[in-house]
Amino acid sequence: MSRLRIYDDANHDTPVAVLEDHAAIADALGKVGVRFEQWEANQPIQPGASQDEVIAAYRSDIDRLMQENGYQAVDVISLKPDHPDRAAFRSKFLNEHTHSEDEVRFFVAGAGQFTLHINGQVYEVLCEKGDLIGVPDGTPHWFDMSVSPYFVAIRLFTNTEGWVAKFTGEDIAERFPRMDPHPSAANAS
């Protein structure tokens, strides 16, 4: 189940709000400029699927988003718990960073946790299958896939170079909860 926890950025122990209703999550995130939608993830895709398989399965949705928002590139990240580079992939995204473009992800399978640092608050968004999140350019955030990653996500970019981060140098990400492994990860290896 998708979830949003909102914290004061000085207090990582107790959230000031916890939301699990998609409409409530979308409303709360929309107020800070973050896009959050629930889509049908109805193609039979599992972590480990090839990029070509995933893109082919969702080609019409990808084309529509690219046309609506001017995205120039698309790729797929697909990880499961036995991926040999899972620790390196995880550490790449765990520190607070920004981008010069929106960060848009559609979760085709599994889950991942985006944590956004906006206006003195921390928005911890657990994205699951069917969730689309759009983090505006310049928004400080980090991403956790857990120690046992289990997800497939389509990534859309306006920059043809793909994922390019500017790290803030702040240690705030170290003070907030990490993502627990997805329940499906136990059976995925």
Locate each region found by the language model.
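Short, conserved beta-strand element in jelly-roll/cupin
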Residues: 98-118
